[in-house]
């Protein structure tokens, strides 16, 4: 997502350069994050790159070391003693969850459909067993069950990333506009643009505190891939991947559960948990659509989403999509 934002920012920079920055963004002192100019967008020091490589290898090394140690043996022995009971509890919970879905208005044959009361020949393979199933599949992407499960997994994954990314785009701008915390660059897409200009970001104004902040775009992309290999590999291996460390996850690949992935124990009540699944996918879909709006706003106005909202509320007749397209 970071790379896509950087590409978008480079396309929109020529347009945004003719717009003056909002006074609320310009007049504030930028004393929290230091920005310095580097020589190239591909600039990289071997010390920092080596540090990121070592840092990305720590999880693999730590897991392997613990699993092969006496501690790992003890953890696995303890897990084996409790696993039978845990599996039985998981089976009972899944049975109650199925009953909750049968009684819920969001699942099954009587669930809401995307055409509402209008008669429509909905795909027979969309049975309403998964959250957020409104019978919408005009392209027939879910005819094959394996493909359907894969796409559902992808949707959940992207929905969660979109919700997290939306917070990451909105919160810095809100803090900056309200004066809670001042950033050198609070607008999400301009951060990527600053990297394309070869700038170095030193977080909190502390010299040297930039992890990959002084690296070029290509090196940052490599770092992101390396740092994501571990979590993605564990997700690919399934929820059993943590059992060598004595961790049992009672759920499935989309909803692992357990203390590690559900520390607040939100899945304790099966009825509430099934409703939370629906709320999650609905809000995740809204977040993914919202990002399309963020991209469009950045390209057309050169501003962040919060500033665009402030402008629209202050003068809705002149600050809207139609007026923007007419100019």
UniProtKB/Swiss-Prot annotation:
Induction: Induced by blue and far-red light treatments.
Chief location of this protein within or outside the cell: plastid
Tissues in which the protein is found: Expressed in a punctuate pattern in cotyledons and leaves. Expressed in flowers, mature siliques and mature embryos.
Membrane recorded as keyword: yes
A GO CC annotation given for this chain: photosystem I
An MF annotation (GO) of this entry: chlorophyll binding
Transmembrane segments: 161-181, 209-229, 286-306
Location relative to the cell: Plastid, Chloroplast thylakoid membrane
Role of this protein: The light-harvesting complex (LHC) functions as a light receptor, it captures and delivers excitation energy to photosystems with which it is closely associated. Probably functions in non-photochemical quenching (NPQ) to dissipate energy under conditions where the absorbed light exceeds the electron transfer capacities of the thylakoid complexes contributing to primary photochemistry.
Name assigned to this protein: Chlorophyll a-b binding protein 7, chloroplastic
Gene source species: Arabidopsis thaliana (Mouse-ear cress)
Originating gene: LHCB7
């Amino acid at each position: 997502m970071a790379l896509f934002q950087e590409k978008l920012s480079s396309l929109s920079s020529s347009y945004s350069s003719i717009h003056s920055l909002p006074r609320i963004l310009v007049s504030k002192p930028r004393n929290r994050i230091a920005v310095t100019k580097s020589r190239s967008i591909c600039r990289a020091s071997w010390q920092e790159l080596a540090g990121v490589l070592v840092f990305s290898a720590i999880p693999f090394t730590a897991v392997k070391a613990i699993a092969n140690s006496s501690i790992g043996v003890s953890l696995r022995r303890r897990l084996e003693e409790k696993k039978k009971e845990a599996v039985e509890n998981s089976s009972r919970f899944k049975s109650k969850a199925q009953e909750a879905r049968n009684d819920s208005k969001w699942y099954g044959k009587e669930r809401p459909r995307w055409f509402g009361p209008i008669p429509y020949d909905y795909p027979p393979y969309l049975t309403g067993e998964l959250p957020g199933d409104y019978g919408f599949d005009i392209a027939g992407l879910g005819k094959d069950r394996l493909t359907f499960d894969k796409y559902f997994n992808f949707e959940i994954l992207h929905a969660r990333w979109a919700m997290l990314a939306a917070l990451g785009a909105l919160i810095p701008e809100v803090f900056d506009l309200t004066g809670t915390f001042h950033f050198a660059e609070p607008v999400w897409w301009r951060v990527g643009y600053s990297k394309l200009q070869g700038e170095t970001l030193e977080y909190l104004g502390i010299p040297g505190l930039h992890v990959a902040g002084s690296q070029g775009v290509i090196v940052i992309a490599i770092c992101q891939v390396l740092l994501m290999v571990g979590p993605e590999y564990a997700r690919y291996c399934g929820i059993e991947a943590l059992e060598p460390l004595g961790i049992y996850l009672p759920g499935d690949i989309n909803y692992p559960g357990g203390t590690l992935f559900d520390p607040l124990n939100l899945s304790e009540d099966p009825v509430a948990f099934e409703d939370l699944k629906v709320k999650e996918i609905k809000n995740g879909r809204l977040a993914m659509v919202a990002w399309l709006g963020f991209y469009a706003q950045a390209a057309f106005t050169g501003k962040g989403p919060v500033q665009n909202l402030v402008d629209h509320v202050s003068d809705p007749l002149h600050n809207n999509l139609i007026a923007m397209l007419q100019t």
